[in-house]
Amino acid sequence: MSQKVGFVGVGRMGANMARRLKDCGYDVSAVYDIRSEAATELATELGTTAASTLAQVTELSDVIITVVIDDASMHTIFASEGDSLLTGAEGRVFINCATISPAVHIEVEALAKAAGAESLEGCMASSITQARDGTLYLMLGGDKATYEKVEELLGKLSVNKRHIGEAGKAAQVKALVNMVMNINPAGLAEGLGLADALGLDLNTVMEIFSQTGANSRVLETDGEDMRDRDHECYFSGAHAAKDSGIALALG
């Protein structure tokens, strides 16, 4: 566990991944967020540095995990000029966990190589609780030797991890996962909504769904919230639309 790990993007997912690695004995060397208050708060909690620049994260870290929002954010943090993770990046490994376009992962890998660094896709198919518990499902893309270099670290974050292939391939699979994931809740919501309109007992309907072809992972994770009309947001409609757009572009 000699690797020093920096984080860029410490929202709910990134922050919980940092907490998990800290608990596992890793040196979380720096955290950075476009919202400086988020980085400062997490740095205080973990006893680490709230980096004021992207370049500082690279300077203080061996492995940098990025958890940003979209393609534009990736282009910003891996900019060819100005403040950038690529500054002084020789020998570093970047693990990029955002759901972004496969082409951007390929582009970032090329930029990292030009800077003497390595880049790996670390696409996640799980949520906030799993990030904290180290039970993420990870789909990895990029050079196999790079994957092996950080495999132990990835194992602390995940209950299951799979190297899919070269750069871009893991992002393609993640786009398909999210496409299907975004379709399933709509079907379940329509079914439960109609059941409610018909005056059926929703607990009975859900139990029958669970034992038939209507069963799904979404029923397990979201069924009770739908029944109770609990609309607390864990994954925004804007993010779902962005992810579905990535899948649409693949066609």
Question: Residue locations for each model-derived region?
Answer:
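Mid-domain beta-loop-alpha active-site segment that forms a flexible
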Residues: G168-E190, L194, S236-I246
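NAD(P)+-binding Rossmann beta1-loop-alpha1 motif at the extreme N-terminus of oxidoreductases
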Residues: M1-V67, R92-V93, C97, H163
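Small-residue-rich helix-loop
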Residues: L200-T212
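Hydrophobic residues within alpha-helices
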Residues: M17-L21, V108, L153, L194
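Rossmann-fold dinucleotide-binding core
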Residues: T99-N182
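Rossmann-fold NAD(P) dinucleotide-binding segment
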Residues: L54-E118
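Interdomain hinge/lid region at the active-site interface
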Residues: N215-G251
